[in-house]
Amino acid sequence: MNAKIRAYVALMKLRVVELLLITTVPVMMLADRGMPSLWLIAVTLVAGTLAAGSANTINCYVDRDIDQVMGRTKRRPLVRATVTPTEALTFGIVIGIVSTLMFGLLVNWPSALLADGAIAFYVFVYTLGLKRRTPSNIVIGGAAGCFPVLIGWSAVTGTVGWSAVLLFAVVFFWTPPHFWALAMKFRDDYAAAGIPMLPVVAPVEVVTRRIVGYSYAMVAASLALVPVAHTGPVYLVSAVVVGAWFLAEAHRIDRRTRRGDDPRPMRLFHMSITYLTLLFVAIAVTAVV
């Protein structure tokens, strides 16, 4: 029984969910211009975890054929037959329904609709539509990971404001550099599975140039938040400092690639997580000072 429970938890990919939820609470604080009720935060986080877990579980169900090919994913529960495909799909659908009801009945229905939209986008647009067909898969499909900022804002206000849209843009432009760095490291895995990630189908110099381009767009979106959300000097200084750090790392990986050196892409991958965390911590601080 414990093995089965662990398998269901693994299907939800909670380490990925953690990163998504890092953005939710600061956005709720910014929308509230203070600290929302702990009850609202708790319900939003639990329901958001279930929504993301639902999308991830259904993704594992759809991708079980390629997961057994990739070294990075071959120990997932469906590959090891810890749970059956039917059990996994049922679990994913059930927790998605629970998430919708929690958002709708305990938060508000706009947030429920956004959560459902995130699940549908990730499953149908990214997993079933783009992932195996185009190197733009993560560029377009990555929008699913941006929904938590919209949900966080909506949970507090019942609407989606321009500040939330800009933060959506920050995460949207952050996603390609983050995942392309990972795909550079595991290029052979993706190639063996037939997934046309950009590092699989394009020269590495093209990949690193695009990483630099998306990094500038991300930093620009983060700075545009200052006049729109009136975030003040604490956020401005933080966004400039961590943005400059990210751009320096993006240029470093591009330079090393052009020199023919090992680009060490996982360095960018890990620091991108730190960047996003620090930026949203600055948003949280701004909301309460």
UniProtKB/Swiss-Prot annotation:
Family annotation (HAMAP family): CyoE_CtaB
Subcellular location: Cell membrane
Protein family per UniProt: Belongs to the UbiA prenyltransferase family. Protoheme IX farnesyltransferase subfamily.
GO cellular component, one term: plasma membrane
Protein's name in the database: Protoheme IX farnesyltransferase
Pfam family name, one: UbiA
Record-listed E.C. numbers: 2.5.1.141
Reported function: Converts heme B (protoheme IX) to heme O by substitution of the vinyl group on carbon 2 of heme B porphyrin ring with a hydroxyethyl farnesyl side group.
CDD domains per record: PT_UbiA_Cox10
Protein source organism: Frankia alni (strain DSM 45986 / CECT 9034 / ACN14a)
Gene Ontology MF annotations: protoheme IX farnesyltransferase activity
Broad class of the protein's primary localization: membrane
GO biological process: heme O biosynthetic process
Residues that span the membrane, as ranges: 9-29, 35-55, 89-109, 110-130, 138-158, 164-184, 188-208, 228-248, 269-289
Enzyme class: transferase
